[in-house]
UniProtKB/Swiss-Prot annotation:
HAMAP family: HemL_aminotrans_3. It catalyses: (S)-4-amino-5-oxopentanoate = 5-aminolevulinate. PROSITE patterns: AA_TRANSFER_CLASS_3. The modification N6-(pyridoxal phosphate)lysine is found at residue 265. It holds the Pfam family Aminotran_3. One of its GO terms (molecular function) is pyridoxal phosphate binding. Its EC number is 5.4.3.8. This is Glutamate-1-semialdehyde 2,1-aminomutase. It comes from the Bacteria. Homodimer. Pathway: Porphyrin-containing compound metabolism; protoporphyrin-IX biosynthesis; 5-aminolevulinate from L-glutamyl-tRNA(Glu): step 2/2.
Amino acid sequence: MTRSDELFEQAKKTIPGGVNSPVRAFNGVGGSPRFIEKADGAYIYDADGKAYIDYVGSWGPMILGHNHPKIREAVLAAVENGLSFGAPTELEVTMAEKVIEMVPSMEQVRMVSSGTEATMSAIRLARGFTSRDKILKFEGCYHGHADCLLVKAGSGALTLGQPSSPGIPEDFAKHTLTATYNDLESVKALFEQYPEEISCIILEPVAGNMNCIPPVEGFLQGLRAICDQYGALMIIDEVMTGFRVSKSGAQGHYGVTPDLTTLGKVIGGGMPVGAFGGRKDVMQFIAPTGPVYQAGTLSGNPIAMSAGLAQMDALCEEGVYEELAAKTKRIAEGFKAAANKHGIPMSINYVGGMFGLFFTEEEKVTSFEQVTKCDADKFPEFYHGMLDEGVYLAPSAYEAGFLSMAHGEKELEETLAAADRVFAKMAK
């Protein structure tokens, strides 16, 4: 029994399922999760001292790599002045200005402490601003675990085979409408049925919680037009894609302007953080300037702001996103080439610094339905093969992979060589 096995058994005695977020339990791939002791650059190290090339990156935030010296120094410097004040700081003003500079659609920003808080608050704001109750989301997309959003959700809910959750009253769920991602007709049909009741559309601009599904051409622009036609707000959930797909997020990459945007992950540099923002007239509806209430004890805390600002400054350096995109293309297409070499059908998607692998004979995966029809048996075999080779991927067929600036030629070559060996074994 490894030290990770021992820790998992110990954890299950005091923590439900032994983990503090369901997908970490390895239910989607079997076996015991690796308990991580430290991380540096492109590598994480488990409790037994084994190193892994990491393509999870704490589920996206570690875009510069783990334990980046600039972020570490910023955090240590901030700690010297205290951990939390429960009062305004100059750091949160600087962070808001930085976000607005990088994402032009965000005219004002409110900091929170998680992505779930951000999406939950943005939806409350949209409902308050429009005086409408219903929201429209997409099947397979995940926007955190707020009650109104755990309706046909993706990510961990898909991994566990639970598209919705007990504990959510039907009276809450009835206000959440679900459309088909990348299908404008399904959206139009719902608006035709409820023309004056839908407050907002919320979506992942790249669906990263049913693996990695980019929008088809015209989809985001079509949603923008529908929102304008019916007076609903468009909320783009960039908790995952924000500052990972491009310097201005997925909205900048695809050329669409939402009314509200939610952020998280990258803007915290690895610290707990979230944010939502958008049009000034909408944001003025949030307390204390408006009637829609939202608050948070640790919102804008100086440690997270310091880490986030250090990371954001580094991301503004010339050539960062071009290099990240080139690395992502190399690893994704390398995976597909290795699979094809051994006769294993695979489709790939990638954009910016994120990618998805699908065990399917279909050339292109663009829908939730296609994702659910992928070969569910092949992924666990592939996953554990790569884990044994020292490559750490997300332990679920429904999660995207992430690269960082710390992934160099050595790591990419070793990863693809490992994939070649694993696919060779799978083909026997």
